[in-house]
From Swiss-Prot:
Protein name from the UniProt record: Formate--tetrahydrofolate ligase
EC number per UniProt: 6.3.4.3
Similarity remark: Belongs to the formate--tetrahydrofolate ligase family.
UniProt GO molecular function: ATP binding; formate-tetrahydrofolate ligase activity
Amino acid sequence: MAKIIEEMINKKGLLIDDYELYGNEIAKIKSIKKLNKKDSKLIVITSMNPNPAGEGKTTTAIGLVDALNKHGYKAIGALREPSMGPVFGMKGTGSGGGLSFLKPFDKINLHFSGDFHAITAANNLIVAVIENEIHNRSSMQIDSQKILIKRCLDVNDRSLRNIEYDINHQQTKSGFNITAASDLMALFCLAHDHKDFEDKLAQTIVAYNIVNQPIRICDLELTKAIMAILEDALYANLVRTNEDNPVFVHGGPFANIAHGCNSIIATKNALALGDYVVTECGFGSDLGLEKFMNIKMASLNLKPDLIGLVISLKSIAYHAQTNEKDYVKQGFANVLCHINHIKKYNVSFIVYINVNTNTDSEEDLLTLEKLLDEHQIEHARSYAYSYGSKKSEEITKKTITLTNQINDHELKLIYDIKDHLSYKLKKICENVYGADGYELSYEAKEQLNRYEHLDFYLCIAKTPYSISDDAKLLNNPKNFKIHIERFEINYAAKLIIAITTTIYRMPGLNKEPAAKNFVMK
């Protein structure tokens, strides 16, 4: 008897050669008949700066997959795996909501197919072997103060940010990152296939020896062990929506402290199987979309066909910071920040209004739509949360029209990977955040001199709640600079991570975490 996921594969006519079942509702896709399909359309979902509960990008993306399929278009989703950090922290589950969610909901939000655990184990094995070399005073002569990779864990645990311990009587300072912000997670999501991952992994610098020579994974003779751990994890996971439409869920870096996009492997699989692929990137366009375009799309040498900007009255009110009647006009300034950013890429775009039928008044929705019309911005309402694919005629029609319109403009990125680091910083701060440049701490100034000429992508870690680096500066702040505290290097994925004020790659739990009296919903 066919499993549920096999029934969907057959019903949708997905040209899959080989897959491995994980229970009744999950399949690891191992090979596809036509991997080089050229005519698929890529739609990426982003948002304004969200309120703390989130903006509904994943729900909107899932709802759009269902809407397109309902109206006769072969659409597939390509989304990130939820991390148990936010699932048990502030945000809660991360696989959609209402009538637009993924199945199996409980498994996806917890252990899923074990990808996160595999990445955690592989990452921590690297650190353990490095420290074992130091403990045994091996000929590699690794400097205990120059270990570049930290341990990781898929739990929010602020006590592990900074730790001190002995390695054979050598005092060492280190810490943990959350798995979603680990170096291996970034490489996992930016690798094009198993071979590409293995090649980049082998050359990854993870430490330096006492005469400042780099120590790579291949020097540690660890490449084969890491590949053995991650062999199955690197295959993309296929699941389904509540309305039985296909979605790949694979990889899960955060966008505020990592690059915030699902795996390239899953995206390539989706493009090979569907005519329309709906993907998303974390938080607002200032974080997720900027990295999606300047890191993921640059790496793939690919231009998306449509950008969908999700906005909501709840987030507009959050940025307006008022209950006055004209809050929509005040909070709309944040929407315009993101539209100005999106326009820089030469990609068609649309605004999706994420409607909450329980709280949003028709009067306020009409006010919002009037503002969008005044700025000549195409828009459509999304009722995905409340109705699933029902009431989806408008969003489907406008999405298909814009996705298929001729756009011969070349993709314009914010920076080139060969630009100097100082120039990359300047371009993002001014063109994405609207800042008056940036300021460096003493530590960051010293690091900038060392990293200035690295041909790496720039990944800025900052708050998601403001276009600036200060979570309290809501809406459309002016006359500010971005403050860079330090730089961290991810040699695996070729990322320079610029850490802004009070940002940690290991989050802490909020005062009343979702883990208390947890309900899977």
